[in-house]
């Protein structure tokens, strides 16, 4: 395994650690259902238990989430190992998506639900967590890679962004 590939897996591990640490702090310091102002007018912390996905979709379907998460994680690890030199955008994106999937998977296996805590005060949006955020950032990075790769292909380059 090359150093670069180790860096991408280290990124995932650090993000999983940050996610689990934030959930631990939430459970230890905020009662279930309680809200604490964090950044006034912007972000509050609300301790919730989510047995589904975003917006509580597929609530209670834990076996489904276990199977999908394992499959997705294996595919991402395979793609990262095979393509880690392809693009920093692509590889960082995969690392972030992997971290998000694993972070929420740990909660589901250990607790039977996912701990959510981040609540936007400036707009009505479902309460989420660090793992959810890393998933979104990862997908954005992969989209940037796809856009840059398509642009490079149109310009006749080899498409390595």
Curated annotation (Swiss-Prot):
Query: What gene name is given for the protein in this entry?
Result: lspA
Query: Which NCBIfam families did the record assign?
Result: lspA
Q: Which InterPro entries match?
A: Peptidase_A8
- Source domain of life is Bacteria
Principal cellular location given in the protein's record = membrane
Q: Which Pfam families match?
A: Peptidase_A8
Q: Which organism is it from?
A: Enterococcus faecalis (strain ATCC 700802 / V583)
* GO molecular function terms noted in the UniProt entry: aspartic-type endopeptidase activity
What is the documented function of this protein? This protein specifically catalyzes the removal of signal peptides from prolipoproteins.
This chain belongs to the protein called: Lipoprotein signal peptidase
Cellular localization per UniProt: Cell membrane
């Amino acid at each position: 395994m090359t150093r670069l590939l180790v860096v991408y897996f280290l990124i995932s591990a650090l993000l999983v650690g940050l996610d689990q640490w934030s959930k631990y702090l939430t459970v230890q310091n905020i009662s279930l259902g309680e809200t604490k102002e964090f950044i006034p007018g912007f972000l509050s912390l609300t301790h919730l238990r989510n047995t589904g996905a975003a917006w509580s979709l597929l609530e209670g379907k834990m076996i489904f989430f276990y199977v999908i998460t394992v499959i997705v994680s294996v595919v991402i690890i395979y793609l990262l190992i095979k393509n880690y030199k392809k693009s920093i955008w692509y590889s960082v994106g995969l690392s972030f998506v992997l971290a998000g999937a694993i972070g929420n998977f740990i909660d589901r296996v250990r607790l039977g639900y996912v701990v959510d805590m981040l609540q936007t005060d400036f707009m009505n949006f479902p309460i989420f967590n660090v793992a959810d955020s890393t998933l979104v950032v990862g997908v954005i990075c992969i989209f940037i890679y796809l856009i840059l790769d398509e642009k490079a292909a149109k310009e006749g380059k080899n498409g390595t962004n």
